[in-house]
Amino acid sequence: MNEFRLNLLQVLGDGSLPRGYYWYRVVAILPDCELDLANTLRVYAPFRGNSIGLFWDEVPGAETYRVIRRRDDEEEGSILVSSPAFFHDTGIQEFG
């Protein structure tokens, strides 16, 4: 099995995420199953009003990915993202 990586692209001050630590995980949605990429990325957002950019290795056959986010004081939530394998978390997206 291939090893897929989840990577931090950038942390910027152009969003609405509060300062603190964020944990992200990505699950690839394939036609017949979901593939948990089994890696977690911990990111520190140092400012008030942050945004966090993530990218990961594309999974062959996946057209959608579930990005899972958790923060110290929040329950885990997720959002669906279409390819390409990139997500810019500005804090205004609805994580369910």
Residue ranges: model-predicted function:
Residues 1-96:
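Disordered, low-complexity "stalk" and linker segments at domain junctions of extracellular
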